[in-house]
C-alpha cells in the first residue's frame, strides 16, 4: 500500500492554472498534489552569441526552489554565490525537453526563457516543472504569433513528464516525498504527445532494478504522461 492510498499507476491530482502572473508572456501554476511550481515564459528578441546569424531561435530554462518550499528552510543559493549541481542539472533537463518540442528555425532569432520556481515541494518537482513549462511555452508562442513576431507556430508537439520508481518492491508512478525518500529506484521520464521519449533518467538507490522492472516503470510513465497530456490540452482549450 502506498502512503497516500493511491494505486500503483495512479498519479496525484493535477491542476494547471494559466495566466497565473501578470507580466510574463506565458505563466502557469502547476500542482501535482502538494507539489506546486510556478512556470513563467519570457519572450526576448535576439539569441545567444553562439547562434547569431544562423536564423534560428533558442529556448532556455532556469529552475529554483524557494527557501521554505521544503520541510525545513533551505538557504537561498544566491546567498552562497553559486547554484548547486542539482539546480543546474534540472535547469538543463527542462531546457533540453522544451527545445525538443520546438522548431527553432520557425522561432526566428528570438529567445524564450522559462523560469520554474518551486513554491512547495512534495516530490516530483522537476517533472511537474517540465509539464507546466510546456503550457507556459505554448502561451508564449501564441503571444509571439499574435504580435507578428513569428509567422508560423514553432510547436512540434506537447511534452510532459512524470516520475516513476520501485517502492517496497513494486513499480509506482508519480512518487511523492515519502515514497521518493524510501524508493529503491527513482526514474524521471519525459515524452512527447506522439509517444516518443525525450529523456529517461533512472537510478537505483540501493537495490539494482531489472529490465522487466524498467519496462514496467516505463509503461506506468507512459500511462501517467498520457493523462497529463489530456490535462494540458484541457487547460489550453
Curated annotation (Swiss-Prot):
Q: Which GO terms describe its biological process?
A: rRNA catabolic process; rRNA processing; tRNA processing
EC assignment: the record states 2.7.7.56
Recorded GO molecular functions are: 3'-5'-RNA exonuclease activity; tRNA binding; tRNA nucleotidyltransferase activity
Function according to Swiss-Prot or TrEMBL: Phosphorolytic 3'-5' exoribonuclease that plays an important role in tRNA 3'-end maturation. Removes nucleotide residues following the 3'-CCA terminus of tRNAs; can also add nucleotides to the ends of RNA molecules by using nucleoside diphosphates as substrates, but this may not be physiologically important. Probably plays a role in initiation of 16S rRNA degradation (leading to ribosome degradation) during starvation.
Residues binding phosphate, per UniProt: 86, 124-126
Q: EC top class, in one word?
A: transferase
This protein's UniProt keywords: Nucleotidyltransferase, RNA-binding, rRNA processing, Transferase, tRNA processing, tRNA-binding
Q: How does it assemble?
A: Homohexameric ring arranged as a trimer of dimers.
Catalyses which reaction?
A: tRNA(n+1) + phosphate = tRNA(n) + a ribonucleoside 5'-diphosphate
InterPro entries attached to this UniProt entry: ExoRNase_PH_dom1 (IPR001247), ExoRNase_PH_dom2 (IPR015847), ExoRNase_PH_dom2_sf (IPR036345), PNPase/RNase_PH_dom_sf (IPR027408), Ribosomal_Su5_D2-typ_SF (IPR020568), RNase_PH (IPR050080), RNase_PH_bac-type (IPR002381), RNase_PH_CS (IPR018336)
Keyword NAD found: no
Q: Which NCBIfam families match?
A: RNasePH (TIGR01966)
Q: Which gene name does the record give?
A: rph
So which domain of life are we looking at?
Bacteria
Per the UniProt record, the source organism is: Colwellia psychrerythraea (strain 34H / ATCC BAA-681) (Vibrio psychroerythus)
Any keyword RNA-binding? yes
Q: What is the protein name stated in its UniProt record?
A: Ribonuclease PH
Q: Which family does the record claim for this protein?
A: Belongs to the RNase PH family.
